[in-house]
C-alpha cells in the first residue's frame, strides 16, 4: 500500500483501489478568498411559496447579495416518460397531460403530432380537429399566462392581482370542462384527432370570454404597469440578453423579451398556424419587466387566434377515418355524463362479433406504429416544447422524451440572479415561469 497527501492506493483482486483522504483540503482553504468568511448558505425551498412548486434554490449570500445560486430539481419526479413505455400509444395522452399541469393541452398536442408523424397520417387529420387543437391551445396559453401574472404579482406584493388573475382563469377552465369534461388533465388531444367534438354551448361561452378578456387586460395594466413599486421590482432585474438566452437554450417569452422574435408558430409552423394572422410580441430590455409586457401582449394575440379559430369551425369529423387507428369520437357524452345508451354502444362497438373484437383489441392492445423516430417541437407558454418519440414497430412506445422548457430555462437563473439582491431572486425566478411538474416529470 502506498500513501500520498490526497489518496491511498492498494491492490485488490479487482485491481487498484484508491481511497480519497481529503489531504488537499488545506490547499482549498488557503486559496479561499478571506471575504468568504462573511458568506452564508441559505436554502430557499423546496417548500417555499415563491419557488413555483417544489424547487430548491441553494443561495450563497454575502449580506443581501447573491454570490452563487444553484437550482436543485427532481422533487416532483413522477417517472411519466418511463411509464409510457408500458402503455399503448393512445394511453400515452393520459400520462403526458399531467406533466406541465398548467399547459396540459400543449403536452397532448406535441405527443399527438409526434405519433401522427410516425404513422404518416399528418395529412389525414381533419380540418375541424386541427382547428379545435389551435383553439384549445390558445385558450390554454391564456390561462397559463394568467396564472403567471397572478402568482408573480402576489410574490412581489400585489395580492389583489392574484385574485383577479385566477378569477379570469376560472372562466377558461369552465370552457375546458364543458368541452373535455375535465378542468385539467384532459387527455383530449389524441393521435388522429381529438376525443370528441366541441358542443355549441361551448362556442357561445368562448365568444363571451373574447368580449370580456380585453377589458380585464386593461384593468391589469392599470393596476400594475404604472405602479411605482411594480416598476421598481421588475425593471433592470433578472436581466438576460439574447446572447445569454441562445447560449443556454432559453426559449419562449424570456427569449422574446430579449429582442429575438423566435416563435415556432411562425418559424416552424404546425397545425396550420401559417394560415392565421397574429404577431410575435418582443421587447428589448431582457428583464422581468420585458417578460411581463411580452406575456400580456401574447394574451392579446391568443385572443385573436381564438376568435379566428372559432370563426373557422366548420361541421365535420374530428377523428381520422381509419378505423384501425381512430377511437370513437363521433358521439357526444349524454346529459347524464355517461353516454352508455344502447344506441351509443351499438354505434361504437358495432352490432357484430367482429366489430366487438376489433374494438376490444384497439382499446386494450392498441394500434401498431411503424419503426422509426421523430422530433416535433411546438410553442408552449414557457417556450419550445419538444417530443422525441421512438417506435420499434410495436403497440407501445420504445421511448418518449420531452424537451421541457421549464427544465431548460431554469439553468439561466444563476446568470440572472448572481450579483443581485436576494429579493430579486424571487422576481427573476418567477419571470422564467417554471412549472416543476414539467421540469421533473
Curated annotation (Swiss-Prot):
Segments passing through the bilayer: none
Subcellular location as annotated: Cell membrane
Keywords: Cell membrane, Membrane, NAD, Quinone, Translocase, Transport
Chief location: membrane
Signal peptide feature range: none
SUPFAM superfamilies referenced in this protein's UniProt entry, alphabetically: HydB/Nqo4-like (SSF56762)
UniProt entry tagged with the keyword Transcription regulation: no
Gene3D superfamilies registered for this protein in UniProt: Cytochrome-c3 Hydrogenase, chain B (1.10.645.10)
Taxonomic superkingdom: Bacteria
Molecular-function GO term, any one: quinone binding
Annotated Pfam families: Complex1_49kDa (PF00346)
Record's GO cellular component terms: plasma membrane
Chemical reaction(s) catalysed: a quinone + NADH + 5 H(+)(in) = a quinol + NAD(+) + 4 H(+)(out)
Function as written in the Swiss-Prot or TrEMBL entry: NDH-1 shuttles electrons from NADH, via FMN and iron-sulfur (Fe-S) centers, to quinones in the respiratory chain. The immediate electron acceptor for the enzyme in this species is believed to be a menaquinone. Couples the redox reaction to proton translocation (for every two electrons transferred, four hydrogen ions are translocated across the cytoplasmic membrane), and thus conserves the redox energy in a proton gradient.
Quaternary state and interactors: NDH-1 is composed of 14 different subunits. Subunits NuoB, C, D, E, F, and G constitute the peripheral sector of the complex.
Protein known as: NADH-quinone oxidoreductase subunit D 1
Naturally occurring in which organism (per UniProt): Salinispora tropica (strain ATCC BAA-916 / DSM 44818 / JCM 13857 / NBRC 105044 / CNB-440)
Lineage, opening ranks: Bacteria, Bacillati, Actinomycetota, Actinomycetes, Micromonosporales
Gene name of this polypeptide: nuoD1
Amino acid at each position: 500500500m502506498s500513501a500520498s497527501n490526497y489518496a491511498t492506493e492498494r491492490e485488490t483482486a479487482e485491481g487498484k483501489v484508491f481511497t480519497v483522504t481529503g489531504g488537499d483540503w488545506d490547499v482549498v482553504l488557503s486559496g479561499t478568498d478571506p471575504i468568504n468568511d462573511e458568506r452564508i448558505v441559505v436554502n430557499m425551498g423546496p417548500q417555499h411559496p415563491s419557488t413555483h412548486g417544489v424547487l430548491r434554490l441553494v443561495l450563497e449570500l454575502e449580506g443581501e447579495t447573491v454570490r452563487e445560486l444553484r437550482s436543485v430539481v427532481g422533487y416532483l419526479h413522477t417517472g411519466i416518460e418511463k411509464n409510457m413505455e408500458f402503455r399503448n400509444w393512445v394511453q400515452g395522452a393520459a400520462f403526458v397531460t399531467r406533466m406541465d399541469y398548467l399547459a396540459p393541452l400543449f403536452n397532448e398536442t406535441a405527443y399527438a403530432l409526434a405519433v401522427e408523424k410516425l404513422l404518416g397520417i399528418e395529412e389525414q387529420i381533419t380540418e375541424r380537429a386541427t382547428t379545435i387543437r389551435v383553439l384549445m391551445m390558445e385558450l390554454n396559453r391564456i390561462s397559463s399566462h394568467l396564472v403567471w401574472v397572478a402568482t408573480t404579482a402576489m410574490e412581489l406584493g400585489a395580492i389583489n392581482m392574484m385574485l383577479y388573475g385566477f378569477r379570469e382563469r376560472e372562466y377558461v377552465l369552465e370552457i375546458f370542462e364543458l368541452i373535455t369534461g375535465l378542468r385539467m388533465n384532459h387527455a383530449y388531444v389524441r393521435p388522429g384527432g381529438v376525443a370528441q367534438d366541441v358542443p355549441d354551448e361551448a362556442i357561445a361561452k368562448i365568444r363571451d370570454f373574447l368580449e370580456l378578456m380585453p377589458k380585464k387586460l386593461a384593468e391589469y395594466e392599470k393596476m400594475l404597469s404604472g405602479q411605482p413599486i411594480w416598476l421598481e421590482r421588475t425593471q433592470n432585474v433578472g436581466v438576460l440578453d439574447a446572447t445569454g438566452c441562445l447560449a443556454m437554450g432559453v426559449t419562449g417569452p424570456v427569449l422574446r423579451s430579449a429582442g429575438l422574435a423566435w416563435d415556432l408558430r411562425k418559424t416552424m409552423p404546425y397545425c396550420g398556424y401559417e394560415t392565421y394572422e397574429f404577431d410575435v410580441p418582443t421587447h428589448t430590455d431582457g428583464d422581468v419587466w420585458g417578460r411581463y409586457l411580452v406575456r400580456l401582449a401574447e394574451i392579446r394575440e391568443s385572443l385573436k387566434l381564438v376568435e379566428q379559430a372559432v370563426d373557422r369551425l366548420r361541421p365535420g369529423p374530428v377523428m381520422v377515418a381509419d378505423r384501425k387507428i381512430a377511437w370513437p369520437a363521433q358521439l357526444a357524452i349524454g346529459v347524464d355524463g355517461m353516454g352508455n345508451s344502447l344506441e351509443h354502444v351499438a354505434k361504437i362497438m358495432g352490432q357484430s362479433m367482429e366489430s366487438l373484437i376489433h374494438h376490444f383489441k384497439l382499446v386494450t392492445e392498441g394500434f401498431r406504429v411503424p419503426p422509426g423516430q421523430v422530433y416535433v417541437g411546438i410553442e408552449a407558454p414557457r417556450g419550445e416544447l419538444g417530443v422525441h418519440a421512438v417506435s420499434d414497430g410495436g403497440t407501445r412506445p420504445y421511448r418518449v422524451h420531452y424537451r421541457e422548457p421549464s427544465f431548460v430555462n431554469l439553468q439561466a437563473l444563476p446568470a440572472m440572479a448572481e450579483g443581485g439582491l436576494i429579493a430579486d431572486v424571487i422576481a427573476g425566478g418567477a419571470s422564467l415561469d417554471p412549472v416543476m411538474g414539467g421540469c421533473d416529470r
